[in-house]
């Protein structure tokens, strides 16, 4: 299968990767977040139009396999396992999250967030994630924190999220990897 960066339908997100990598690294620095020892298991996109999501899907189907397709928070989300990774900082992501547009509008179409796995009790996720971030970083103008518990129709694992954003890119923390969540769906 082809490398994702050579697929015509994915040309815009290939070109967007350096911007995302720079913005993510800058956000981590602002937050005092040492990303080196952390396991990030997937990367996610955002788009404004269904036609963009459909084009990206066609592209990912040429360079990976569909792991999961689910309705989460009222919109379709596909997960693809790529044959060649998306490289950001020291990470090599083989899983890409492709959500269709929802009610929220994002400032940029392209790469939007990474998801870091902090194994442990779901009830302690927020405290464990916040302990990795510098207080002075969290107090900076433009930094926002959000907690949520997104859930797919057949998911069996509680999957709370703590997200930290600067409005451009986001770092999300979860207690489970996305592949563990997908496996829990098959137990339904």
Residue ranges and their predicted role:
Residues 2-41, 45-188:
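Glyoxalase I/VOC metalloenzyme domain signal
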């Amino acid at each position: 299968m082809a490398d994702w960066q050579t697929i015509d339908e994915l040309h815009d997100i290939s070109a967007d990767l350096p911007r995302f990598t720079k913005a993510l690294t800058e956000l981590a620095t602002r937050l005092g977040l040492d990303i080196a020892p952390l396991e990030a298991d997937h990367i996610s996109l955002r788009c404004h139009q269904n036609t963009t999501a459909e084009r990206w899907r066609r592209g990912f189907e040429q360079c990976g396999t569909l792991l999961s397709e689910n309705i989460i928070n009222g919109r379709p989300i596909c997960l693809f396992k790529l044959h060649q990774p998306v490289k950001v900082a020291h990470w090599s992501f083989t899983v890409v999250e492709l959500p269709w547009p929802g009610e929220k509008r994002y400032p940029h179409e392209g790469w939007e967030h990474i998801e870091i796995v902090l194994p442990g009790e779901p009830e302690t996720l927020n405290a464990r994630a916040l302990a990795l971030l510098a207080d002075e970083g969290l107090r900076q103008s433009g930094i926002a924190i959000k907690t949520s518990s997104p859930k797919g129709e057949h998911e069996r694992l509680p999957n709370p999220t703590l997200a930290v954003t600067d409005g451009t890119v986001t770092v999300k923390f979860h207690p489970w990897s996305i592949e563990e969540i997908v496996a829990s769906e098959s137990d339904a």
